Amino acid sequence: MEKLDRLSEAFKMLLKQEKCSSQSEIVTALQALGFKNINQSKVSRMLSKFGAIRTRNTKMEMVYQLPTELSIPTTSSPLKNLVLDIDYNEVLIVVKTSPGAAQLIARLLDSMGKSEGILGTIAGDDAIFITPTHSTPMETLIKNITTLFESSF
């Protein structure tokens, strides 16, 4: 595993423990795990990159943590990890996504266009409404969309 990947995994593991209340504690813990060149500014950048926040743990201590419901999608996030649910009725498809991912995914769906059966999309923060064209059977469009999400890595 690449050194940056190991550092990222160790960093996430520390924050999941909900014990680090300061950046200096994170630096010390990472150094104890063998990351000797880590410093406070690097930890600060990592906290921003991973969307970490300070919040109270079960002992009412202020600690850094990575809330999964607030995770920020990136361009390297597989689509199948960002799509939570797909549902539809006779006239509309609704795709539920991770928070912040709907507009990215709607843009991709819009690029498929009318030839693939998509008349248009409306995206919020975590939901997309998809309107199919008249000429495309709903089941065919659902299958195409599901295949797109499952094949994207």
Swiss-Prot record:
Pathways involved: Amino-acid biosynthesis; L-arginine biosynthesis [regulation]
InterPro entries named among the record's database cross-references: Arg_repress, Arg_repress_C, Arg_repress_C_sf, Arg_repress_DNA-bd, WH-like_DNA-bd_sf, WH_DNA-bd_sf
Cellular localization per UniProt: Cytoplasm
GO molecular function: arginine binding; DNA binding; DNA-binding transcription factor activity
SUPFAM superfamilies: C-terminal domain of arginine repressor (SSF55252), Winged helix' DNA-binding domain (SSF46785)
First-listed, main subcellular location of the protein, grouped into a coarse class: cytoplasm
Keywords: Amino-acid biosynthesis, Arginine biosynthesis, Cytoplasm, DNA-binding, Repressor, Transcription, Transcription regulation
One record GO biological process: L-arginine biosynthetic process
GO cellular component, one term: cytoplasm
One Pfam match: Arg_repressor_C
Protein family per UniProt: Belongs to the ArgR family.
Free-text function comment from the UniProt entry: Regulates arginine biosynthesis genes.
PANTHER family noted in UniProt: ARGININE REPRESSOR (PTHR34471:SF1)
Protein name per UniProt: Arginine repressor
Gene source species: Haemophilus ducreyi (strain 35000HP / ATCC 700724)
Gene it is expressed from: argR
